[in-house]
Amino acid sequence: MGSVSAKKGVIVLVPYCLQGHMTPMLQLASILHSKGFSIIVAHTKFSSPNPSDHPEFIFHALPDKLNGFDTSFMNLLNVMEAINSSCGGPLVDYLVEIMKDKGQVISCIIHDAIMYFAEAVASQLNLPSMVLRTSNVAFMESHRDILRLHSENRFPLPDSELENPVPGLDPLRFKDLPVSVSSRIHDKIIEFFESYMNIRSNAAIIWNTTQVLEKYALNKLHHHYKVPSFAVGPFHKMVPASSSATSYINEDRGCIEWLDKQAPNSVLYMSLGSLSTIDEKELEETAWGLANSDQPFLWVIRPSSVNGSGWIEHLPEGFQEMVGDRGLLVKWAPQKEVLAHPAVGGFWSHCGWNSTLESICEAVPMICRPCFSDQIVNSRYITHVWKVGLELEQPSDRRVVEKTIRRLMVADSEEKEMRQRMLDLKTQIESSVQKGGSSYNSLNDLVKFIASFP
């Protein structure tokens, strides 16, 4: 553990350990550091960041009691519960040490919404706290509706209601809510949602979003919570150019050389993110639909992302011979750089919020293949609100896969209109992060807000 030299003050950031949460928290850290704050990142030992990627920060590992714990995707709720029950005491001890023994003055604690134990720590130590929401506002609104339906004893919903719109959350349907509403929701899930949604004594909410995409939802949220909300996203567009990468997974940079040889807007980039998985049947149907589409592709198949498979051994026989040099398979890619490449004309996406923002910022229309949680909500907004993507209605049908790929990648009036909408959003977002823009102004307001803490 090193020491920090306070400039405007010391901010303690408490990220959640998964890639999709760690990335925006470290981006926020870089943004605030560039504004003159010193940064301490208090993280779990499990799935911890690499301190050498950010030598400008102090990193402190919190004992999380996850050694030997089942940390698989199916047990994530228990992982979250274990972290919140075990990390509070160690964080108190660490902060008391640096405040009393080292004389450092902490301006505030900013914690991921999942790491709600940090708010209790802040209250105990009389420190201001703020919560970072790494998803979009619509996802948080969907949680509020789940809690409302639960309080009205509406679960399970009958099949006849699943296609109906959720009141006040158009265009979301009940089946788009981020839990299975056609069955009883376990009490533990409801308890987690209540903790996740409750801002308690947090002084403000920070969002990795922009008024360009969610102005109405942000205004609605402000009226509900009555605390300041700072929409300072997209974070990756606000981060100083010198900031280091935040990926846990080794990136195959050879794919950039391959893209350099492809025609403009010709390549379909495919990735389901750092957590989502598919079964062997979907892999096979996706592969044949892709092969039959005759479109060039860069396909990220993360190791163990296909159930029962180490990597690509379950790809159908003859697939790689059929596509030849038209396609490239990699284990992981430098996604922001890939999406910014002129050869990339489409993104087969799981619709995680980070990926959604990155795709919109590079004006790359999407094929939406959501798997769980906020991805389902994001997909609906991509296809029905911003109208910059296509829904993959049957991912395990090669004919549907082929048709959807062709529909996105082969230029016609619909595809041209979608690309124009993407370009318009990209232009608006670029303006929002420049001087006088909504995100630029919101960041300045956030800096002033933190600096106002005693």
Curated annotation (Swiss-Prot):
Gene Ontology MF term list: quercetin 3-O-glucosyltransferase activity; quercetin 7-O-glucosyltransferase activity; UDP-glucosyltransferase activity
Gene Ontology terms: biological process: (-)-secologanin biosynthetic process
Source species of the chain: Catharanthus roseus (Madagascar periwinkle)
Main function: Iridoid glucosyltransferase acting on a broad range of substrates, including both 7-deoxyloganetic acid and 7-deoxyloganetin, curcumin, genistein, luteolin and kaempferol.
Keywords: Transferase
Protein name: UDP-glucose iridoid glucosyltransferase
Binding site for UDP-alpha-D-glucose: 274, 350-358, 372-375
Organ and tissue specificity: Expressed in leaves. Low levels of expression in roots.
EC number: 2.4.1.-
Similarity annotation: Belongs to the UDP-glycosyltransferase family.
Stored SUPFAM superfamilies: UDP-Glycosyltransferase/glycogen phosphorylase
Record InterPro entries: UDP_glucos_trans
Coiled coil: none
